[in-house]
Design a protein with these regions (language model features):
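Bacterial N-terminal signal peptides that target proteins for export
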Residues: 1-7
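Bacterial N-terminal signal peptides
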Residues: 9-18
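Membrane-proximal, glycine/serine-rich, low-complexity loop/turn segments characteristic
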Residues: 22-51, 57-317, 337-379, 419-441, ...
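Flexible, surface-exposed loop regions and adjacent strand-edge segments
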Residues: 155-158, 259-268, 318-328, 382-391, ...
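Extracellular loop and loop/strand-boundary signature of outer-membrane beta-barrel proteins
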Residues: 217-218, 272-277, 333-340, 401-408, ...
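Outer membrane beta-barrel strand-and-loop segments of large Gram-negative receptors
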Residues: 275, 415-417, 459-465, 475, ...
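Surface-exposed, low-complexity loop segments enriched in small/polar and acidic residues
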Residues: 304-306, 310-338, 366-409, 437-463
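Signature of Gram-negative outer-membrane beta-barrel scaffolds
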Residues: 405, 431-529, 538-539
Length: 618
């Protein structure tokens, strides 16, 4: 009987758990599920699953090789938020909107990409404001190589860390848009229309129109900011990629400030009260275009151009009272200063490079050319009136210091470079690059000052000048790039021999002379990574030449109370910076250290001239 029962149980188990090639799923949170075929025992039953749900804690950060991934599903933001709201919730991410700087764990980010392509011309503010959070699936942080660096295989040594956004598949190929109208008390408002079209291959189109008065804390009906921005990335087959962006910005801001402070001195307590009225009107227009053309597998052409034009009108009205006691009857000095500054500025930059690989080893030649410049015209009108109530003039009244000046400050700068580079590989991991180039630069700045207190507005020689600097140079570059399994080493040096011609006209005097100078720019970077710990060491050095004003022996009397005299014997200064960074991946711990110093730095010697025995006051 017992034997029959055992035999019956064995037959039932055999029917329920037949021998088969069952599919076993190895599940890991965050990984793709790959089925593996294994021969299993007859005691295992093949189960076909329609759905697998894995419940576990998601990680906000993950690191693979040199790329940091940020899982945005772990972050919560309000509905309709933009990318700026999202990054402010990321630990270690710092955003300084006033200085247009974005950094992660102390490392500056140079731009924002969409699916691997540049977004909004690397304008960080425009990218963060125009990207909706709902479209973001994943954020990636890495050091992005340019198309030229990928072609030659040599890193130029400059950090180019970017924030790359992977869009959700539901948004790819779909046109999305938002319409926002927010109005509150004290006439606060924000109106915005936005449209986006993203593709997984990096193509994207974005257009935003916004008008608001939330960009500053000053309340007023005339304060506003209007922005029109757009971006397009278009690929023509596999060879041509076009990237263009446009930004138009108008900003008006008025404010009123009242200050009061006390100074406790040995001679007695002083009280100061001031009122400042200011009005700023700024308009800026910027455009950027890049074209990448892969002519064939061995030839690459890059062309880029960008420029901007802006104008501003700033008016300030400042009134100040200084009391010996906190009563108006004991006023020591009182003054008013009205300053109006109007400026028109523009700059441009055009560059092109052509790279051709030769031979089977991967050697290449590169021709690079750049052309850039900027100009600015500034008109500054100032009216200053200061009364010294305890200092009597010749007729017994309060002494008066009156200034009514107009300064015209035009500046102009043009620069051009052309170079030839040769890259030679030594195996698959080591490459050497050498190059030779020519450099020309010309800077000119002028100050024309007029006295508006006199009806005919005479020209003031002592407060006017014209400076011109012309540089002709030859540049030699050497660079080494090594990429191994754990080590990445990049080092190089740029040496430029310059002929600098300096000319200055001031107070009917002219100085014109030529000097020779040599500039050194060494760079070194090493990174070691074993998968758990990453250690990075960087060194940068550069030669800094003294300014025109510091070299000229002519007296600079633009400020009568501080007359400056240059020193033609000044030598160049050398500045260097050493940084080390250690990143522990498991616990996300980062250590950073920086050291910088200067050799032969510039300093000013101050000599106080005693006042004359007799002073004439007006």
């Amino acid at each position: 009987m017992i034997i029959k029962r055992i035999l019956l149980i064995f037959i039932i188990l055999l029917l329920l758990f037949p021998t088969a090639n069952a599919t076993i799923l190895n599940l890991v949170v965050g990984d793709t599920i790959y089925p593996t075929r294994k021969h299993v025992s007859s005691l295992h039953k093949t189960i076909e699953l329609d759905e697998v749900q894995v419940i576990g804690q998601r990680k906000l950060f993950s690191i693979r090789k040199d790329t940091t991934f940020i899982n945005t599903d772990c972050l919560r933001v309000r509905k309709g938020a933009n990318l700026e709201d999202l990054i402010r919730n990321i630990p270690g991410m710092e955003y300084d909107k006033a200085n247009r700087q974005l950094s992660f764990k102390g490392k500056p980010l140079n731009g924002v990409n969409i699916n691997g392509e540049t977004f909004m011309g690397n304008d960080i503010i425009a990218a963060l404001e125009n990207m909706p959070t709902d479209a973001v699936e994943l954020l990636k942080l890495y050091d992005m190589l340019s198309a030229l660096e990928k072609m030659t295989g040599v890193d130029d040594g400059a950090d180019n860390y970017v924030l790359d956004i992977k869009t959700k598949s539901t948004y790819n190929g779909s046109l999305t848009g938002t319409l926002t109208a927010e109005h509150g008390n004290r006439d606060r408002r924000r109106d915005e229309v936005q449209g986006n079209l993203f593709n997984a291959d990096g193509e994207n189109t974005s257009l935003t129109l916004r008008s608001d008065n939330l960009s500053n804390m000053n309340i007023g009906g005339n304060n506003f900011q209007n922005i029109l921005s757009g971006n397009i990335v278009k690929k023509f087959g596999k060879k041509i990629t076009l990237n263009a962006s446009l930004s138009l910005n108008a900003f008006h801001n008025g404010s009123e400030n009242h200050d009061y402070d006390e100074q406790y001195l040995s001679s007695g307590t002083k009280y100061r009260e001031s009122m400042l009225l200011s009005l700023s009107k700024n308009h800026s227009n910027a455009a950027n275009i890049n074209l990448q053309y892969n002519i064939d597998k061995k030839t690459l052409l890059n062309i880029s151009a960008n420029g901007n034009f802006g104008r501003s009108d700033n008016l300030t009205d400042n009134t100040t009272y200084l009391y010996e006691r906190n009563t108006a009857a004991d006023t020591l000095t009182s003054g008013t200063l009205r300053n109006n500054t109007k400026s028109n500025g523009k700059n441009y930059h055009v560059s092109a490079d052509l790279t051709r690989r030769i031979g089977k080893a991967g050697a290449s030649f590169t021709v690079k050319a750049t052309l850039g410049g900027n100009s600015n015209e500034t008109n500054n009108t100032s009216l200053s009136l200061t009364k010294f109530h305890h200092l009597r003039n010749a007729v017994g009244g309060d002494s008066l210091l009156l200034r009514n000046l107009c300064q015209q400050l035009p500046t102009l700068r043009n620069e051009s470079r052309i170079s030839l580079q040769y890259t030679h590989p030594f195996g698959k991991q080591l490459k050497l690059q050498t190059g030779y180039g020519l450099h020309h630069e010309e800077d000119r700045n002028t100050s024309n000052t007029y006295d508006y207190t006199i009806p005919n507005r005479p020209y003031i020689d002592s407060l006017s000048y014209e400076n011109t600097l012309s540089i002709c140079g030859q540049e030699l570059t050497l660079r080494m790039d090594y990429k191994g399994k754990q080590w990445k080493i990049n080092s190089g040096i740029d040496v430029e021999w310059q002929r600098r011609n300096i000319c200055r006209q001031h107070n009917s005097e002219t100085v014109d002379y030529t000097v020779k100078a040599t500039e050194y720019k060494p760079k070194f970077g090493a990174k070691w990574n074993n998968g758990k710990i990453e250690v990075e060491l960087r060194y940068n050095g550069n030669t800094q030449q003294p300014s025109i004003q510091a070299l000229l022996t002519l007296d600079d009397k633009s400020n009568p109370l501080s007359v400056k005299i240059g020193n033609p014997q000044l030598k160049p200064a050398y500045q260097q910076q050493l940084s080390i960074r250690l990143n522990e991946r498991k616990y996300g711990i980062t250590f950073m250290g920086n050291y910088h110093n200067s050799f032969n730095d510039f300093a000013e010697e101050v000599t106080y001239v005693p006042p004359p025995e007799q002073c004439v006051t007006l």
